[in-house]
């Protein structure tokens, strides 16, 4: 059996139908969530300098309209030309009270200056109305936009107002303003702020996380109530994700994250129902499908001449990864090999699914009979960290393959347990001398990062995941809601609400996995370029927003600019 045969069964053997979905016109917000605080400071690059020059301050009046802002704006001349007598004669002092010169010429441009001030208020995230608002403790740190507007330095200081829902300091995470396409159109900008749930939800949730991390309990409760009004399991991707993130924050505040996570696991649907949800996720989220595809391609290539194969699958779940590989092995020109699969699943997951590993065994037995391939299934209900060589019963003459698919991040590392079970497991596997070891993992770093950084990373990662689901399944589809609740929500809650040994969702980036595997004695086994080319073509059938990158023999699958899944092989 060669890779072409394996991929043939990947495409046709499992009755997989590829349809080009209607692209969902999701807008990518220029504002990114970030838990850091920002303060407006002395920046020569602020766009205010081009819109609010001292020599353009023709007139201001001391009317209620012009005193509606509670912000303090100070214009300080930095050159002799700007400090000349004509500038001083204007008597303009932009402090708590606005004073103007008595020259009647200034009154003629009152309307223009009112418009200029409204533009400035828009940039500073002021509310829609002209009514004075209460200042908050939030401050902006120095921000420099990507595009240089004016080289002349100005100092603009202010205390930020209580922002609109989702409009605050955190939206400046990218360190700048929109680029050249940005226009000073107050009405349009305010409408965009009101209508874009990306801005509203992300900023509200970030403020909730900040208040929680700083023990500002009263503010946290108020923000939670505000956030509940803009999240929904039926809304935009960020609104759906926000519903689960918010529950994670509430659970963390109540120290109930662990109980909620365990309850979610115990409330998993029955085996057949969960298997159905996982298959839906498998079909609408090609990351998992093509992660399996890459791993199976590496296994097929490494074992192509072997007649006695033993696959050890840590966290076998529903066993769907092996359907197409078994079909391909059964079609070998010289006859199928003997296949033995050891499926490992932790007792909690097995209990939650009812029949547990039995249903996986029944499925594999049915496939064995249908495709006439000698197949033996050995269930092993034990935590991965407790697996020993003796449990695996390695037999002489077996060509061994070990598979870690979205599982290894569940194993604690040195930050949780001084014995470092994660690296210990890899060393144990290396001691088995497998012909190939495959690893598929989420491309995220939620392992040792502090809470606020972890919250921002989780929101960014799953935002891309939820957006990609929208590209392939209608938003009002009831199955989509069930898939997100049963397959994704519990992971999100665990990352946000739990700590210590109770936080089992501890993702790491490919670079970190590479370091761990190398220290355990593994060497990279480059994935087939043919497999990668086929995956690249199939991704295009879903959406042109999917990406595939090859790095050091590994494969990275993503949505837009966000990498979501890594697949690699080792020996």
Swiss-Prot record:
Signal peptide: none annotated. Belongs to the GRAS family. Residues 199-259 are annotated as: Leucine repeat I (LRI). Residues 192-571 form the GRAS domain. It is found in: Nucleus. Residues 278-343 are annotated as: VHIID. Keywords: Nucleus, Transcription, Transcription regulation. This is Chitin-inducible gibberellin-responsive protein 1. Residues 61-77 have a biased composition (Polar residues). PANTHER family: OSJNBA0084A10.13 PROTEIN-RELATED (PTHR31636).
């Amino acid at each position: 059996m060669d890779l072409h045969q394996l991929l043939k069964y990947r495409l046709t053997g499992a009755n997989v139908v590829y349809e080009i979905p209607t692209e969902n016109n999701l807008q990518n917000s220029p504002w990114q969530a970030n838990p850091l605080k920002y303060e407006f400071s002395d920046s020569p690059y602020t766009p205010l300098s081009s819109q609010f020059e001292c020599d353009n301050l023709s007139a201001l009046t001391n009317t209620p309209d012009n005193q509606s802002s509670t912000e303090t704006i100070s214009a300080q001349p930095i050159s002799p030309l700007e400090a000349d007598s004509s500038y001083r004669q204007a008597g303009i002092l932009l402090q708590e009270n606005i004073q103007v010169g008595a020259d009647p010429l200034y009154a003629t441009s009152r309307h223009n200056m009112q418009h200029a001030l409204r533009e400035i208020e828009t940039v500073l995230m002021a509310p829609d109305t002209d009514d004075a608002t209460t200042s908050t403790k939030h401050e902006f740190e120095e921000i420099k936009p990507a595009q240089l507007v004016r080289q002349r330095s100005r100092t603009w200081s202010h205390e930020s107002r209580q922002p609109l829902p989702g409009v605050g300091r955190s939206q400046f995470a990218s360190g700048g303003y929109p680029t050249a396409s940005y226009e000073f159109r107050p009405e349009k900008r305010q409408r965009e702020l009101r209508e874009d749930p990306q801005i509203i939800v992300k900023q509200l949730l970030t403020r909730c996380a900040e208040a929680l991390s700083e023990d500002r309990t009263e503010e946290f409760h108020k923000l939670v109530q505000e956030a509940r009004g803009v999240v929904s399991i039926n809304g935009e991707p960020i609104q759906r994700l926000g519903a689960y993130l918010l529950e994670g924050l509430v659970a963390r505040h109540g120290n109930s994250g662990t109980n909620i996570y365990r309850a979610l696991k115990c409330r998993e649907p029955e085996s057949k129902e969960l298997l159905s949800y996982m298959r839906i996720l498998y079909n609408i989220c090609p990351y998992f499908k093509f992660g399996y595809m890459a791993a199976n391609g590496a296994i097929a290539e490494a074992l192509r001449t072997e007649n006695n194969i033993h696959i050890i699958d840590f966290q076998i779940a529903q066993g769907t990864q092996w359907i197409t590989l078994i079909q391909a092995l059964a079609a070998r020109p010289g006859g199928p090999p003997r296949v033995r699969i050891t499926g490992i699943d932790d007792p909690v997951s097995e209990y939650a699914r009812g029949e547990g590993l039995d249903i996986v065994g029944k499925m594999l037995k049915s496939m064995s009979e249908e495709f006439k391939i000698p197949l033996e299934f050995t269930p092993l209900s034990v935590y991965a960290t407790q697996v020993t060589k003796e449990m695996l019963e390695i037999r002489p003459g077996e060509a061994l393959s070990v598979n870690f698919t979205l599982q290894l991040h569940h194993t604690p590392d040195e930050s949780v347990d001084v014995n470092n079970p994660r690296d210990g497991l890899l060393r144990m596997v290396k001691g088995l001398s497998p012909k190939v070891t495959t690893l598929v993992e989420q491309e995220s770093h939620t392992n040792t990062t502090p809470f606020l950084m972890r919250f921002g990373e989780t929101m960014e990662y799953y935002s891309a995941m939820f957006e990609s689901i929208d590209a392939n399944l209608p938003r009002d589809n009831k199955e989509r809601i069930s898939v997100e609740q049963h397959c994704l929500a519990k992971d999100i809650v665990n990352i946000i609400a739990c700590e210590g040994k109770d936080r089992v969702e501890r993702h790491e980036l490919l670079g970190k996995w590479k370091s761990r595997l190398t220290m355990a004695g593994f060497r990279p086994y480059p994935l087939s370029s043919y497999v990668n080319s086929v995956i690249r073509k199939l991704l295009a059938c879903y959406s042109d927003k999917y990406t595939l990158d090859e790095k050091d023999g590994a494969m990275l699958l993503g949505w837009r600019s966000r990498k979501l899944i890594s697949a690699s092989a080792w020996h």
